[in-house]
């Protein structure tokens, strides 16, 4: 009896780059993403998680990962809020633009769960809302990841 498991597919590695600001909220996205990828694909997908200090570091890290050739896609996730010192829209825009540039220059899909709310106050109500919202966004990102990988596979066939 053959005790070796043989798959008729290759495992696709997905990199997740998460910012550590508001880690408890951002981690909900990552957990939901991992769970949804497992639900959708079983062992077809392997998710590797990488931490960066803040959102601003995501594009460079995503590019470094994409250029290795080991990843079929990269997800960047962060929670960019108004800290009262500088305009958070500037940071969010720079991060999203950087992520777009990474996918266009490397050919590796880079998905975004980098969210910047219009208003965020460090209150129990806002924390609870975004804690739950990042769970939804993680599931959505997983479905988008599977869809874009399937679309690219179809193009390559």
Swiss-Prot record:
GO molecular function, a single term: 6,7-dimethyl-8-ribityllumazine synthase activity
Residue sites binding 5-amino-6-(D-ribitylamino)uracil per the record: 21, 55-57, 79-81, 112
Pathways involved: Cofactor biosynthesis; riboflavin biosynthesis; riboflavin from 2-hydroxy-3-oxobutyl phosphate and 5-amino-6-(D-ribitylamino)uracil: step 1/2
Domain of life: Bacteria
EC number from the UniProt entry: 2.5.1.78
Family: Belongs to the DMRL synthase family.
HAMAP family given in the database record: Lumazine_synth (MF_00178)
Protein name per the record: 6,7-dimethyl-8-ribityllumazine synthase 2
Protein species of origin: Mesorhizobium japonicum (strain LMG 29417 / CECT 9101 / MAFF 303099) (Mesorhizobium loti (strain MAFF 303099))
């Amino acid at each position: 009896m053959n005790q070796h498991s043989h798959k008729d597919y290759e495992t696709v590695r997905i990199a997740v780059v998460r910012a550590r600001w508001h880690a408890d909220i951002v981690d909900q996205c990552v957990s939901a993403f991992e769970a949804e990828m497992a639900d959708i694909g079983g062992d077809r997908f392997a998710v590797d998680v990488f931490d960066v200090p803040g959102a601003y570091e995501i594009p460079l890290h995503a590019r470094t990962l994409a250029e290795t050739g080991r990843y079929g896609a990269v997800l960047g996730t962060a929670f960019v809020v108004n800290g009262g010192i500088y305009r958070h829209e500037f940071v969010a825009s720079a991060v999203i633009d950087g992520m777009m540039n990474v996918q266009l220059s490397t050919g590796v899909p880079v998905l975004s769960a980098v969210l910047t709310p219009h208003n965020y106050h460090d209150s129990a109500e806002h924390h609870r809302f975004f804690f739950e919202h990042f769970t939804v966004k993680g599931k959505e990102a997983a479905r988008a990841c599977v869809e874009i990988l399937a679309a690219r596979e179809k193009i390559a066939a």
